[in-house]
Regions:
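Domain-level signal for soluble alpha/beta catalytic cores
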Residues: 1-315
Length: 315
């Protein structure tokens, strides 16, 4: 029984953390930068650790490292040397590990009755490196070898720090997911996959998510979880049903709070959903999701709502 199975056996349902970027902004960090959260990881890792601690205290069981935008080519293009880039990427796993141990040993985590927190090494798509909103579109215009080289270097560096799982997240392209899965399978590492989606049935490049789940779940023994993230809350119930119809893997969802992303100015606009995030979580768990969390524009407040719903749901 692996870490995920143990946690699900203990709790029935799990809670994923919330947005790293929004929480960092609330701490005063400026993120209008091509490296986005990776700039903070490089220059002020203490803020990243504080965000992890906030989500640990809020009740999250599964935590994503601050490595979504931390890529070797991106760091090199922004003035870091190759050794510095490698260190920054590896640091993302260590910073979470430090926060986890501090919470577990010094803040009562061990006595809380909660599961030992799961660390997910976050890996964003090629579109995140482009920093132009392509993670919501796909169709990058590059060949398979370019995608393979892009993902291989970061996978290798993250695995040197032995995270619990790799997490390929906000993936708009099924072709890219298959390449990433091939690399993870070759490494022998267990991994999760989470898609960005157009609507309640299709990933951003237009493929039916049910078919993606059906295809991906065959011949990939190290794939442990499939899900969606960075999507509008109103699409999630349908997406959960589609994923569950396509495979037997645990399904996760961590949507945005409801705003829309503007990639040029790098801002979110529009009001958040009037329905509470906790009420959304209740419906997602009822639809069969194994774990729920938040993506962009969510903070520890939202995750506390999810954790409260999970407790009631499990009870």
């Amino acid at each position: 029984m692996d870490r995920l199975q143990e946690a699900l056996a203990q709790c029935g349902r799990l809670v994923i953390d919330g947005s790293m970027s929004t929480a960092l902004e609330h701490l005063g960090c400026k993120l209008n930068d091509k490296l986005w959260t990776a700039r903070v990881l490089a220059e002020h890792p203490e803020y990243v650790k504080e965000v992890h601690l906030q989500y640990l205290r809020a009740g999250a069981d599964c935590h994503i490292t601050c490595s979504y935008q931390a890529t070797v080519p991106g760091l090199l293009e922004n003035g870091f040397t190759a050794p510095e880039a490698a260190e920054i990427i590896r640091r993302s796993v260590r910073v979470f590990r430090e926060a986890r141990e501090e919470w577990w040993e010094r803040e009562g985590g061990r006595e809380s009755g909660r599961v030992y927190p799961i660390g997910l090494a976050g890996i964003g798509p090629y579109g995140a490196y482009l920093s132009d909103g392509s993670e919501y579109v796909g169709r990058y215009g590059v060949d398979d070898e370019t995608l393979r080289a892009f993902h291989e270097s970061r996978i290798r560096l993250l695995l040197e720090e032995k995270p619990d799982y790799l997490l390929f997240e906000t993936m708009p392209s099924f072709r890219e997911v298959l390449i990433a899965a091939e690399l993870a399978e070759k490494s022998g590492a267990d991994y999760w996959v989470s898609f960005s989606c157009l609507d309640g049935k299709h990933i951003c490049e237009g493929d039916e998510i049910r078919q993606c789940a059906e295809t991906l779940s065959k011949g990939h023994p190290h794939l442990k979880v499939i899900g969606v993230n960075c999507v509008k809350p109103q699409f999630v119930e349908s997406l959960i049903h589609e994923l569950k119809a396509g495979c037997d893997l645990p399904v996760i969802a961590y949507p945005n709070s409801g705003e829309t992303w503007e990639p040029v100015q790098k801002i979110w606009y529009g009001g958040a959903e009037k329905v509470s995030f906790g009420e959304h979580a209740r419906r997602y768990y009822a639809a069969g999701a194994a774990a729920i969390g938040g993506c962009c524009t969510t903070v520890d407040f939202h995750i506390r709502q999810v954790a409260e719903v999970r407790r009631a749901f499990a009870g």
